[in-house]
């Protein structure tokens, strides 16, 4: 029920605060406790992916669907944090940045859609693709980007997370990858229900204003730039994530030797 600005703040910044706290404080300050908790945390990540996906399936409110999909995608970050892999940790950093951009854009587009239709109920939408230039196409791009469209930052982040976490927990990664399939289903269903099908109303709809279009296109450019050239982000986070990985890997090795 939050306004669009509050939803963008939640998706782009506040949702990442917990992950930042885990990487910055929980793992370095409590490596042994984190190592004990790691298997549980990784399975909780899988649960978050599946739970968020199934809740997204059940939604008729488009904004609530985007919110639950954000919960699902953050499950990948939780898996990466407790994998003990440097590659996965760097993937988590990229994923948090990319998800912040894509989720923020989707919330902005939901707000723009609400301003024109005065409803967020997808059952009252449909038949909009040909009547609203730009907005449906941009929504489709960001929905695909959130799934990990190659060429976007989400693809780089999720790929690094899955590749880095696989040696530590193969079954967790396999199930998490299946969650991407669920994500594709509910995202494409959202686009189909909101923009395609028979029109529920023939009332004229206002096209996107230049300010609205430039705002989301700017986010799209940043997302593509992060996907095509993520090296500056990886270089910037390399030293910090290496330190976190060293502390956590040492605790994991010690725990394995004791057992």
Residue ranges and their predicted role:
Residues 2, 132-134, 187-259:
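Cytoplasmic/organellar membrane-interface segments at the starts of transmembrane helices
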Residues 1-190:
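Hydrophobic transmembrane alpha-helices and their helix-loop junctions in integral membrane proteins
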């Amino acid at each position: 029920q939050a306004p669009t600005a509050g939803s963008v703040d939640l998706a782009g910044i506040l949702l990442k605060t917990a992950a930042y706290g885990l990487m910055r404080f929980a793992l370095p300050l409590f490596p042994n406790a984190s190592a004990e908790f790691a298997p549980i945390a990784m399975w909780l990540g899988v649960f978050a992916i599946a739970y968020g996906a199934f809740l997204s399936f059940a939604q008729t409110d488009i904004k609530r669907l985007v919110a639950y999909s954000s919960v699902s995608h953050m499950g990948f970050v939780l898996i990466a944090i407790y994998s003990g892999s440097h590659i996965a940790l760097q993937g988590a950093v990229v994923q948090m940045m990319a998800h912040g951009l894509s989720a923020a854009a989707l919330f902005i587009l939901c707000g723009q859609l609400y301003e024109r239709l005065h409803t967020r109920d997808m059952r009252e939408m449909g038949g909009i693709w040909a009547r609203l230039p730009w907005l449906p196409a941009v929504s489709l791009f960001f929905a695909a980007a959130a799934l990990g469209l190659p060429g976007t930052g989400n693809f780089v982040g999720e790929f690094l997370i899955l590749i880095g976490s696989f040696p530590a927990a193969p079954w967790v990664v396999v199930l998490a990858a299946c969650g991407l399939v669920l994500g594709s289903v509910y995202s494409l269903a959202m686009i189909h229900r909101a923009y395609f099908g028979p029109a529920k109303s023939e009332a004229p709809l206002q096209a996107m204003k230049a300010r609205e279009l430039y705002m989301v296109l700017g986010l799209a450019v940043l997302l593509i730039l992060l996907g095509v050239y993520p090296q500056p982000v990886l270089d910037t986070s390399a030293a910090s994530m290496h330190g976190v990985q060293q502390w956590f890997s040492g605790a994991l090795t010690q725990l394995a030797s004791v057992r």
